[in-house]
Amino acid sequence: MHLLDTLAEGLKEIDARGLRRRRRTADTPCAAHMTVDGRAIIGFASNDYLGLAAHPQLIAAIAEGAQRYGAGSGGSHLLGGHSRAHAQLEDDLAEFVGGFVENARALYFSTGYMANLATLTALAGRGTTLFSDALNHASLIDGARLSRADVQIYPHCDTDALSAMLEASDADVKVIVSDTVFSMDGDIAPLPRLLELAEQHGAWLIVDDAHGFGVLGPQGRGAIAQAALRSPNLISIGTLGKAAGVSGAFVAAHETVIEWLVQRARPYIFTTASVPAAAHAVSASLRIIGGEEGDARRAHLQQLIGRTRAMLKATPWLPVDSHTAVQPLIIGANDATLEIAATLDRAGLWVPAIRPPTVPTGTSRLRISLSAAHSQADLDRLEAGLQQLGAKAA
């Protein structure tokens, strides 16, 4: 069979199982109210948790950065592409999130996926055992596979099982890997216990704070700051295209760890540095996140989270016990989930249907993503739509 025929058959199978993914095209900036595929909608799909993606100060910072540093970096960070904007952002990030370790540094990446691959492949290898939460993000899973380390998967947030696995391991190097906020469930990892286990067993703890950075902790400094953790064994990874409203990612750790990544992390070394203007805008975003406006946006977001939790409990479906901006509602079957999402879409509400392989079979769900840009009136619309669908399903 020709390769194209093989792919076509595979696509037919994806369609038959109700698993084909389709891109939608936004005609306006990321915001609570958008025009998508030519239609006005209220969006509950983005990870713009603080509503900063269209913030006037960040738009101005992008323009200023482009005027100062140009449209592109022109090279990799080690071959001419490392600009003053990148260097300044790394200093800003180290100061903002690096309080968990002495002599902290930060390293800026183009994407969170690259940051996770870079960290795991540079720090782990043969002779290393990675202990990975069962619901970790795909980029952590792929990084673990590419590292060539032995990988042991522990049940989701089950620290008793993890403890037993660590006790039984005779690996030269042990690394615990976990999301902080899990992207499809919205729950938070037991970070204090994970760090306790890491220190007991002389292990690294690498956490991906993609959905916690900017939202959790004092001044939005993230899940590690919220848990008040400090340790040289700790490495924090965060993204800058979610709550920060721009793009990119970072790794924060002791300066020796960061220098090792500069020397050995292939996804950092062998790629063109990101647009300097984006780095310039992220520095502006950090000032908003850590200031009074950031506090006000987080407070409003918490109000929306509380209301949404109560709203979802009143439906005939299964809400996940999430206290974060990720509010899942488990429907179960793929077809039913797609139909509910389509009905909400016809009512002008964009609520994504999440299906396998992103989530386990039988747990297809609506993933309601809240933003400080949403108003109570936006939630009124969502609540009305869910109530109508719930009445039909009851």
Swiss-Prot record:
Substrate binds at residues 21, 137, 358. It comes from the Bacteria. Coiled coil: none annotated. Its EC number is 2.3.1.47. It catalyses: 6-carboxyhexanoyl-[ACP] + L-alanine + H(+) = (8S)-8-amino-7-oxononanoate + holo-[ACP] + CO2. Pathway: Cofactor biosynthesis; biotin biosynthesis. Keywords: Biotin biosynthesis, Pyridoxal phosphate, Transferase. Its cofactor is pyridoxal 5'-phosphate. InterPro entries: Aminotransferase_I/II_large (IPR004839), AON_synthase_class-II (IPR050087), AONS_Archaea/Proteobacteria (IPR004723), AONS_Proteobacteria (IPR022834), PyrdxlP-dep_Trfase (IPR015424), PyrdxlP-dep_Trfase_major (IPR015421), PyrdxlP-dep_Trfase_small (IPR015422). GO terms for biological process: biotin biosynthetic process. It is an enzyme of class 2 (transferase). GO terms for molecular function: 8-amino-7-oxononanoate synthase activity; pyridoxal phosphate binding. Pfam families: Aminotran_1_2 (PF00155). The modification N6-(pyridoxal phosphate)lysine is found at residue 242. Pyridoxal 5'-phosphate binds at residues 112-113, 183, 211, 239. Belongs to the class-II pyridoxal-phosphate-dependent aminotransferase family. BioF subfamily. NCBIfam families: bioF. Homodimer. Catalyzes the decarboxylative condensation of pimeloyl-[acyl-carrier protein] and L-alanine to produce 8-amino-7-oxononanoate (AON), [acyl-carrier protein], and carbon dioxide. This is 8-amino-7-oxononanoate synthase. The gene is bioF.
